[in-house]
Each structure stands twice: as structure tokens, then as C-alpha cells.
């Protein structure tokens, strides 16, 4: 019975922090605000998350997991690698609109860090690497030459991330749509070779 309560408290803390980090950012969200809004004791927070940095890392993993779950659902039944890449841009656009153009959680957090934290840096790099590898795996199904596949994947990933950031800046999906058109053109020219 105790384990269920611990999971519930941990989850409640994480949900509260997720909302606050998303709405007002990491730096503007204080530990005391998280404690107050979650309605928990300070000891409970520190039992589950020894530091704000640890809480942030859990938040980043949660957001990344949610993104990949949504992406998996969005790509269900699509076998063609080119179409999977293109539909990934559509999924991101839907995600951005749904989240009021909040952007990528990893990029948002890292951009707030004048003094980069080792735990958060590692988490962001790990999560971005997972996204990059997603595009690498698809590019390798399109392009048999390993070097060309890597160049293709890196280009797509840069367009994806850059488009995401620009959507956050302009609060509009137009930049991601432009990035998607560039990727379609890139994939089309690759097909014609």
C-alpha cells in the first residue's frame, strides 16, 4: 500500500512541476511554489526529488516520453520512411498548436540556463540524441550509403529543431511548414537520383 502512495505523491509533484515549468519556465518556478501548489510537505518533495535539478530531469524525461508516445500514435500504420519523416513534422505542428507554441521542453530549459547544470545538460543531450537517432534510423532506410544517410538525417533533424524553435518565436506553425517543405524537396531530390 505504501508504494502506491509514494507513486501518487511523486506523480503529483511531477505533474505540478510540469505545469509550472511549461507555463512560467524553469527559472521562474521556485521549489516553494511547487510545494505550495502541490500541497505537499517540503520533505516529500526532497524525498522524491533531491534537488530542483533532479525534478527538472524527471520533467524532461516525462515530456520526451509523452512526445514519442504521441508520435508513435501519429505514425501508426505508416510504413514508408519518407512519409514517416514528413508526418513527424505534422505531429510536431499539432503538438505545438495544442501546447500554445511552448516549443521543445529541452530547448526551453537549456536556453534558461546561464550556468549550465551537469544533470540537466546530460538529460537534454540524451533526449536530443534520441530524437536525432529517430531520424538517422529512417534516413538509413532511405539511403544505403552510410555517410549520405547521416548527412540526410542531420539535415532533417536541424530543420525539425530549427522549425520548432521558430514556431515558438513566432507563435505560428508556418516556420515548421516551411521546414517540412524543404524536407519534402530534399527527399524528392534523393528519390530522383
Feature-to-residue mapping (PLM):
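Amphipathic alpha-helical packing segments from all-alpha helical-bundle domains
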Residues: 65-68, 73, 83, 116-143, ...
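Amphipathic alpha-helical segments used for helix-helix packing
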Residues: 98-118
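Helix-turn-helix
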Residues: 12, 16-54, 58
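Hydrophobic/aromatic-rich alpha-helical bundle segments in the mid-to-C-terminal region
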Residues: 120-129, 142-190
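N-terminal positioning helix adjacent to the helix-turn-helix/winged-helix DNA-binding module
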Residues: 5, 9, 13-16, 152
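N-terminal intrinsically disordered/low-complexity leader segments
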Residues: 1-8, 191-193
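Hydrophobic alpha-helical connector segments
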Residues: 58, 62, 72-98, 152-156
